[in-house]
Amino acid sequence: MRMLLCLNVLTLSCVWAIAMEIPMSTVVKETLIQLSTHRALLTSNETMRLPVPTHKNHQLCIGEIFQGLDILKNQTVRGGTVEILFQNLSLIKKYIDGQKEKCGEERRKTRHFLDYLQEFLGVMSTEWAMEV
């Protein structure tokens, strides 16, 4: 019953966020604030071990980040304002999954591929932490 209630609340919040067209940047900012607010509660179980990617390029470790999040969510007392934190993180995951679907390939001319590759390498050179 509790799981059903949680799923209903999560579904309602997703629908609400979509209906209200809240920008994902706003959801991310609110989630960062909530994370800071609830950090003490989330770190109260010092015996829990979560997977932490050793790679510094977070874009490459999304799966591992959300795997750790699922473990944390399952080990944390639910309810109250911490529930909103997990709902927002779920919204962010759904957004990222939706964006990953846009990675589907489309056959184009070599010039288009090279333009995309150049843009990708530009992002790598400016936004990714490069290891020596």
From Swiss-Prot:
Its main location: secreted. The keyword Nucleotide-binding does not apply. One of its GO terms (cellular component) is extracellular space. One of its GO terms (biological process) is cytokine-mediated signaling pathway. The keyword Phosphoprotein does not apply. It is found in: Secreted. Glycans are attached at N45, N74, N88. Gene3D superfamilies: 1.20.1250.10. Keywords: Cytokine, Disulfide bond, Glycoprotein, Growth factor, Secreted, Signal. It comes from the Eukaryota. InterPro entries: 4_helix_cytokine-like_core, IL-5. GO terms for molecular function: cytokine activity; growth factor activity; interleukin-5 receptor binding. Residues 1-19 form the signal peptide. PANTHER family: INTERLEUKIN-5. Homodimeric cytokine expressed predominantly by T-lymphocytes and NK cells that plays an important role in the survival, differentiation, and chemotaxis of eosinophils. Acts also on activated and resting B-cells to induce immunoglobulin production, growth, and differentiation. Mechanistically, exerts its biological effects through a receptor composed of IL5RA subunit and the cytokine receptor common subunit beta/CSF2RB. Homodimer; disulfide-linked. Interacts with IL5RA. Interacts with CSF2RB. Belongs to the IL-5 family. This is Interleukin-5. It comes from Rattus norvegicus. The lineage of its organism: Eukaryota, Metazoa, Chordata, Craniata, Vertebrata.
